[in-house]
């Protein structure tokens, strides 16, 4: 069981240093069992879709929800965690990923293994967070109601000024993107799921140059038919890429981070002859040619647009073409096999 805590915060909010402190406490005390997400409001780190979603669940700042339950002050995170972590979830989530540093495209797989039968509208959400986020200017300085110690101790914030200058603070667990939306895609799974079933959904993000993937985490949230987070998952991007990208179905409606405007993606690329080819074309063929123009593989595009190619191609450079149902070439990519 991984408990997910979503904290509403903002640099303008003087009491939000309490939230920062308790998010740190939770990460230090329950690492691997707690997935913390700092959802910013009214500052340079805001993700509008996420901010609006969390805003509908709270009455003020700082505040938050644990596993999408009742509103709770950040000081109540430990108690809510200890209550929820004892629950046996209906499924566990495994994070996988592939990151292409050249194109800055991140593909994420969330593999859900069910250990009991479920039914109804279950959903799966993918969140990206980043640690050590910082910037320059007054909007990056943190208001601090605990300055001077008059409001008691708060993890060292009582020893810092208000505002805390931008060059003296950085921000952790910062929500960077949420997909496909705050609520998730309706009916992400079949209406009835059997005990032992496994389902994998795939998500695609374009990573801006000022994000540090070495400091980023992938958090999965399985939302049950009551709108509560049944279980979560957490891993660094590096851990997820070490696991690799699991085969699955691409989710649609990525919020803020639209799927790349490309008819085809190949990953990994370069590779050892084993790869996944993803295309937005729902009918047609994918053909692979060597540099001499010889056809070495032809595959019919399946309904989900996902092709696993395991032909163990020889080392070299290949050209991959996507053909639509009228046999027209609609996309071409260079493939390198090492």
Question: What is each model feature region?
Answer:
Residues 1-32:
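Local sequence-structure signature of Cys/Sec-based thiol-disulfide redox active-site neighborhoods
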Residues 32-251:
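Short, conserved sequence motifs used for protein processing/export or organelle targeting and
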């Amino acid at each position: 069981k991984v408990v997910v805590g979503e904290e509403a915060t903002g640099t303008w909010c003087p009491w939000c240093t309490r939230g920062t402190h308790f998010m740190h406490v939770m990460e230090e005390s329950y690492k691997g069992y707690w997935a913390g997400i700092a959802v910013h409001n009214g500052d340079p780190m805001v993700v509008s879709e996420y901010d609006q979603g969390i805003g509908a669940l709270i009455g003020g700042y700082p505040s938050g929800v644990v596993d999408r339950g009742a509103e709770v002050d950040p000081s109540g995170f430990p108690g809510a965690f200890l209550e929820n972590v004892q629950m046996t979830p209906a499924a566990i989530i495994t994070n996988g990923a592939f990151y292409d540093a050249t194109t800055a495209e991140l593909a994420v797989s969330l593999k859900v293994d069910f250990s009991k039968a479920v039914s109804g509208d279950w959903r799966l959400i993918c969140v990206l967070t980043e640690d050590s986020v910082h910037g320059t200017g007054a909007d990056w300085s943190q208001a601090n109601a605990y300055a001077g110690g008059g409001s008691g101790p708060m993890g060292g914030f009582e020893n810092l000024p208000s505002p805390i200058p931008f060059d003296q603070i950085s921000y952790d667990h910062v929500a960077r993107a949420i997909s496909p939306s705050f609520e998730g895609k309706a009916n992400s799974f079949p209406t009835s799921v059997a005990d032992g079933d496994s389902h994998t959904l795939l998500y695609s993000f374009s990573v801006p140059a000022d994000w540090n993937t070495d400091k980023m985490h992938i958090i999965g949230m399985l939302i049950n038919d009551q709108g509560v987070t049944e279980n979560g998952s957490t891993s660094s991007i590096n851990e997820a890429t070490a696991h690799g990208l699991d085969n699955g179905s691409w989710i649609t409606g990525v919020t803020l981070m639209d799927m790349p405007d490309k008819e085809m993606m190949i990953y990994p690329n370069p590779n050892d002859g084993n790869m996944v080819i993803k295309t937005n074309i729902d009918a047609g063929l994918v053909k692979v040619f060597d540099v001499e123009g010889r056809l070495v593989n032809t595959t019919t595009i399946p309904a989900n647009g996902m092709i696993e190619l395991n032909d163990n191609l020889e080392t070299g450079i290949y050209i991959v073409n996507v053909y639509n149902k009228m046999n027209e070439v609609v996309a071409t990519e260079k493939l390198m096999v090492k």
